[in-house]
């Protein structure tokens, strides 16, 4: 199981084996985080590429 942490303040947000789409607001720093296509053993074929996009409204995509 993988620990998912906020990239801004490093707070543990949740633990998961895999997921397709997660939207969460960090309870500590209030940053809005969107995570797409992550799995325990990521491959481009099964999980897609992970990328980080930062917007002016403090939304972060991984």
Swiss-Prot record:
What is this protein's gene name? com
Keywords tagged on the record: Activator, Host cytoplasm, Late protein, Metal-binding, Transcription, Transcription regulation, Zinc, Zinc-finger
Enumerate the subcellular locations listed in this protein's record, separating them with semicolons. Host cytoplasm
Q: What is its main location?
A: host cell
| Cofactors | Zn(2+)
Q: How is the cofactor bound?
A: One Zn(2+) per molecule.
Q: Where are the zinc fingers (Atypical)?
A: 6-29
From the UniProt annotation, give the residues forming the signal peptide.
none
According to UniProt, the name of this protein is Translational activator com
Q: Which InterPro entries match?
A: Translation_reg_Com
What family is this protein classified in?
Answer: Belongs to the com family.
| Molecular-function GO terms, alphabetical | zinc ion binding
Give the protein's biological function.
Trans-acting positive regulator required for mom mRNA translation. Binds the com-mom mRNA 5' and destabilizes a translation inhibition stem to expose mom translation start signals.
Q: What's a GO cellular component annotated to this UniProt protein?
A: host cell cytoplasm
Residues binding Zn(2+)? 6, 9, 26, 29
What induces its synthesis? Expressed in the late phase of the viral replicative cycle. Expression of late genes is activated by the viral late transcription activator C.
């Amino acid at each position: 199981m993988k620990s998912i942490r906020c990239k801004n303040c490093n707070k543990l947000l949740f633990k998961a084996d895999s997921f397709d789409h997660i939207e969460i607001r960090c309870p500590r720093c209030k940053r809005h985080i969107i995570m797409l296509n992550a799995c325990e053993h990521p491959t481009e074929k099964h999980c897609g590429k992970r990328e980080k996009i930062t917007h002016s409204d403090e939304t972060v995509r991984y």
